[in-house]
From Swiss-Prot:
It comes from Aedes aegypti (Yellowfever mosquito). InterPro entries: GPCR_Rhodpsn, GPCR_Rhodpsn_7TM. PANTHER family: G-PROTEIN COUPLED RECEPTORS FAMILY 1 PROFILE DOMAIN-CONTAINING PROTEIN (PTHR45695:SF22), LEUCOKININ RECEPTOR-RELATED (PTHR45695). G-protein coupled receptor specific for adipokinetic hormone/corazonin-related peptide (ACP) (EC(50)=10.25 nM). Is not activated by the closely related peptides AKH and CRZ, or other tested peptides. Belongs to the G-protein coupled receptor 1 family. It comes from the Eukaryota. The chain crosses the membrane at residues 109-129, 142-162, 182-202, 224-244, 276-296, 342-362, 378-398. Disulfide bonds join C180-C258. Residues 409-446 are annotated as: Disordered. It is a multi-pass membrane protein. Residues 412-421 have a biased composition (Polar residues). This is Adipokinetic hormone/corazonin-related peptide receptor variant I. Keywords: Disulfide bond, G-protein coupled receptor, Membrane, Receptor, Transducer, Transmembrane, Transmembrane helix. One of its GO terms (molecular function) is G protein-coupled receptor activity.
Length: 577
């Protein structure tokens, strides 16, 4: 795997057998002069270190060539950023150094790397800039995680790809021992980080589906997961700075290379480290991601069966008339599709190279028969994952903007449906909620609303014959009084998802959950336009907080159905029962 340490070999090395294990490094290096290069391909180099051009081959006619098979293969898939071999080495009948040459394949690979750099750098920079410029995206958990994933992809673009290109051009390492350790550490770090952030995204979506109303806890949990992703990536990449170092060729003192040569005393040790890297970067994240989305699919399936058994919901005496497939559910599904697509792209890009890596680890002889150009292509496909993510984001954003534009009036004013989409996007996690929040207590009489400033309004709860209603005591524009009459026919138009039809001022009005109206018979008992509205949810434990941006007709006792309440936030109020 490209996170494996690998061994960028300076020359064809003999197999590490007992007769070599006790020799000094110089003796082992010199022993290569007696081994023959059996193919025109270069000795392979390791993924973690860069292109094949870093290797210098030695050729001789005095050996059967069996000795170079181990290291030529080891430099291939276990760590090579560019595959087993792409440099042509001319066969020689005399013992000596054969300098690598830049073939058409090498030039083509460099060109592809440059194209990938342009796409990855431009696309991910656009994603980061867009997210930082949008206030609502800065408040979103999903957007925050996508931003971290874009940062990891930018590190691939600005660290890994230039390192690959430069190494292929210069062949040897010119930057010194400190740079060798730092760059190889950073190269592994950004790749670990990318897979770890995908795990965070999947777990966040899993918790969002299972606990849709625990918004405050979800934001804190998301930040903790992202911090853990960075820490784990850092810890996993530390060995790279230990095992890699600059070494000089014993027979060509001016030739230096950043290698792990001589660090692993046996092939088993190197294989174990390479296997650890494959598991930590690919298989372990993939297992967690698969488990998370399995839970999500099971939860969605269970909810679908519940909807089939009941077209309407009942809680106590409150009858809720809602759409079967609600806008908030659609918003969550859009977010879920986005995250699943990102994971599928990751698996699609990396799986072929991982399979080839494992193939080499357990059957080197047959793996070495694979054409070097194919191996180069497999790794380029893996690196292209950093280019694919911005394309996924862009495609998703375009699909979301088309219906939004259709819902705009000719004069540019947002229609109620468009406002509703913004509200449901907030609940789905794609748009951040406002700063207002409710602090839940075990005692429902002690629920406190903390507004945008220092104001704290105590929310009193009282029960009626067929429902629970809320009374919010405050002054000025924040004043809302809602009361109902039990047997007199009072109804509360609230639900967790979708639109609700209510009777307001003698007429039927269909509004999304961002609005609330209480009626007694055919008239509104008491309703004043407020800056903040609270909606009692069907589970009698949670409230919905809406922050309206304007009211078109703020008359005291009439609810205007054209009101735009802006973004909506779901809140879990704790231990109500």
């Amino acid at each position: 795997m490209y996170l494996s340490a690998g061994l960028r070999k300076i020359m064809d090395n003999p197999p590490v057998t007992s007769k070599y294990q006790h020799r000094s490094q110089d003796e082992m290096l010199s022993a290569n002069l007696n081994h023959q290069q059996t193919t025109n391909g270069s000795p392979s180099t390791t993924m973690m270190l860069g292109g094949d051009a870093a290797a210098v081959a030695f050729a001789s006619s005095s050996s059967n060539g069996a000795g170079d098979a181990y290291f030529r293969g080891l430099a291939a898939l276990t760590g090579n950023a560019s595959g087993i071999s792409s440099m042509d080495m001319s066969n020689s009948t005399e013992t000596g150094i054969v300098a690598p040459g830049h073939t058409e394949t090498t030039v083509a690979v460099i060109i592809v790397y440059c194209v990938l750099f342009i796409i990855a750098a431009g696309g991910n920079l656009s994603v980061v800039i867009t997210l930082f410029r949008s206030r609502r995206h800065r408040r979103s958990r999903v957007s925050l995680m996508i931003c971290h994933l874009a940062v990891a992809d930018l590190m691939v673009a600005f660290i890994m790809i230039p390192l690959e290109v430069g190494w292929r051009i210069t062949v040897q390492w010119h930057a010194g021992n400190v740079a060798c350790k730092v760059f190889l550490f950073m190269r592994a770090f950004c790749l670990y980080l990318s897979s770890n952030v995908l795990v965070c995204v999947s777990l966040d979506r899993c918790f969002a589906v299972i606990y849709p109303l625990r918004v405050s806890a979800a934001r804190k949990r998301g930040k903790i997961m992202l911090g853990g992703a960075w820490f784990i990536a850092f810890a996993n990449a530390i060995p790279q700075s230990i095992i890699f170092r600059v070494q000089h060729h014993p027979n060509v003192p001016d030739f230096t290379q950043c290698v792990t040569f001589g660090f692993f005393t046996t092939p088993a040790m190197e294989t174990a480290y390479n296997l650890f890297c494959v598991v930590a970067m690919y298989f372990m994240p993939l297992m967690v991601i698969s488990a998370a989305y399995t839970v999500i699919l099971c939860e969605i399936s269970n909810r679908s069966r519940e909807k089939e058994t009941s077209d309407t919901s009942h809680t106590g005496g409150m009858r809720l008339r809602c759409n079967d497939l609600t806008h908030i559910e659609r918003a969550r599904q859009r977010t879920l599709r986005l995250t699943i697509t990102i994971v599928v792209v990751f698996v699609w890009c990396w799986t072929p190279y991982v399979v080839m890596t494992l193939w080499y680890m357990f059957d080197r002889e047959s793996a070495l028969k694979v054409d070097g150009a194919i191996q180069d292509g497999l790794f380029l496909m893996a690196v292209s994952n950093s280019c694919m993510n911005p394309l996924v984001y862009g495609s998703y954003a375009m699909k979301c903007r088309r219906p939004w534009r259709r819902q705009m009036a000719p004069n540019g004013v947002q229609t109620p449906n468009a406002a509703q989409r913004r509200s449901t996007d907030a609940v789905s996690g794609m748009v951040g909620p406002h700063s207002d929040r409710l602090t839940g207590r075990d005692n429902k009489d002690e629920l406190v609303y903390e507004g945008g400033g220092t104001e704290r309004n105590k929310l009193k709860q009282f029960g009626m014959a067929n429902g629970i209603f809320a009374r919010i005591g405050s002054t000025g524009r924040n004043h809302v009084t809602m009361a109902g009459g039990g047997a007199a026919g009072t109804s509360v138009a609230t639900t967790r998802f979708g639109n609700c039809t209510t009777t307001v001022g003698g007429r039927n009005v269909t509004e999304p959950i961002r609005t609330v109206a209480m009626s007694s018979g055919s008239r509104v008992k008491s309703f004043q336009p407020s800056y903040s509205e609270f909606v009692m949810m069907a589970d009698e434990r949670s409230l919905m907080l809406s922050r309206p941006s304007f009211y078109s007709d703020p008359t005291p006792n009439e609810f205007d159905s054209t009101v735009d309440c802006g973004l909506t936030r779901s809140l879990d109020t704790g231990g109500w029962r």
